[in-house]
Amino acid sequence: MESSSSKGGFKVLIIGGSVTGLTLAHSLDKMGVDYRLLEKRKEIAPQEGASIGILPNGARILDQLGLYNAIEQSAIALGTSDVYFPDGFHFTSSYPKRMHDRRSFAYPIAFMERRKLLEILYDLLPDKSRVEVDKAVSRIEEHPEHHGVLRAYTHDGDVYEGNLVVGADGVHSRTRREMWRLSGSSPTGDVPVSERNSTSVEYACIFGISDGIAELTPGRQVMRFGNGWTLAVIPSRQGQVFWFIVQKLDREYQYGSAPRFAPEDAAEQCSKLARLPIHGDVRFDDLWQRRKAVNMAALEENVFQTWSCGRLVCIGDSIHKMTVNLGQGANCAIEDVAVLCNILHHALNEKANSELSDQDVEALLRRFHKEHFPRVSRVYDMSWSVTRVHARDGSMRKFVGRYVAPYFGERLQGRLFNLMADAAKIDFLPLPRASRSGWEEYRSSERNALLWASSLALLIVLIALFTGRSYW
């Protein structure tokens, strides 16, 4: 416990020890704020067969926290992406290289094993005693005697206390359910049933890691778009290949009713792509036969409207969940940490040694939502669209993917660069790397809005010419 040296004795309980929770732990440590992290799993970094993309918006924050150098040594930076279509047409995109260009963002689009990232985030914590595993939270309550304190009860009977509880426990968040329950007795009213049931599932993903194949070049991504599915292959370092298949399901499901998948389901789906060419003579079956880890899961999609109640707030996948195609799930969660900590840092400094009242905490959490909700919604909307263009879901999206992106990609990529440049950072920590012009050049502005409008107009004209229909 470090309450004597923390800011005003303020303590944060973090529920969940994945990327979001561990990043928050590092940020709170930099702030000098006491915390305790509770992870329900028996280990911090289990093997789940998944890779993770670290994009410039997440990388910049991790660099501010002193973590990126270790990550960079284990990750593979993408240089190009070879994109293939069902009719045999293919093109090579330099979008990843442009993102990393010295005139852009200084950080690449990089991939690494998710388990390795978790190991780095945990190993570099200054005080690992603040992290406890096998601590599944069963309920959260207000302290019956001490005002301004919440209690988290774990399955083994332990009780933990904090002035702020942050749910970083993923899409199946127990913290979110407790927030909904507590909101029923809040003056602001209950969370409506329509919001509680707003998460949908239309896609599933098979994540895999295979032993390397000599014909596949590290850092040269291969993407194949099919009707209703997308395959991405990322050859990495240390003789590994990361890959994933995003598959459209038979219908749209509501959260809770989506199918659960067994290893046999993944094997059945992958067998259908066995003869699919990857590069040269390499077929997908070559990756499957060399698999080291495989997992299949539903891909939930939603941005919840309600993020907090009283002294309890949710971040990361517990409040916004998107598909993997854009690679922004974890990176957006890292931004959550930056925005929340910026606001908390300001509030604690304003109060000096005084306690943050209920009104203070509720105000800062409302500010967190107000400032960050538009950003999260924008990232979510783009992720939603990219996934469906990749899966060729509908005639218009087929047209955009096949006939617009290959030829007008650089103009349309400006929107992705805008998305990156508008990202949050930690305001109270320095930027370790020299600022690159991309962060300012591509930040949303009237000029960039006009450029995007002209690109959209071009797209509409092309679609009209192709379909013979007017969209004006």
Curated annotation (Swiss-Prot):
Residues carrying a glycan: N197
SUPFAM superfamilies with a match to the protein in the record: FAD/NAD(P)-binding domain
Major enzyme class: oxidoreductase
Location(s), subcellular: Membrane
Coiled coil: none
Documented EC number(s): 1.-.-.-
A single Gene Ontology CC term: membrane
MF-aspect GO terms: FAD binding; monooxygenase activity
InterPro entries named in the record: FAD-bd, FAD/NAD-bd_sf, FAD_mOase_fung
Domain of life: Eukaryota
Pathway membership: Secondary metabolite biosynthesis; terpenoid biosynthesis
TM stretches of this protein: 448-468
GO terms (BP aspect): terpenoid biosynthetic process
Membrane topology field: Single-pass membrane protein
Residues engaged in binding FAD: E39, G53, R114, D317, A330
Signal sequence region: 1-27
Biotechnology: Diterpenoid pyrones display various biological activities and FDDP C shows anti-cancer and anti-HIV activities. FDDP C also shows inhibitory activity of 42-mer-amyloid beta aggregation that is involved in the pathogenesis of Alzheimer's disease.
A Pfam family assignment: FAD_binding_3
Cofactor(s) for this UniProt protein: FAD
Alphabetical UniProt keywords: FAD, Flavoprotein, Glycoprotein, Membrane, Monooxygenase, Oxidoreductase, Signal, Transmembrane, Transmembrane helix
Function: FAD-dependent monooxygenase; part of the gene cluster that mediates the biosynthesis of diterpenoid pyrones. The first step of the pathway is the synthesis of the alpha-pyrone moiety by the polyketide synthase dpmpA via condensation of one acetyl-CoA starter unit with 3 malonyl-CoA units and 2 methylations. The alpha-pyrone is then combined with geranylgeranyl pyrophosphate (GGPP) formed by the GGPP synthase dpmpD through the action of the prenyltransferase dpmpC to yield a linear alpha-pyrone diterpenoid.
Stated family: Belongs to the paxM FAD-dependent monooxygenase family.
UniProt-recorded name of the protein: FAD-dependent monooxygenase dpmpE
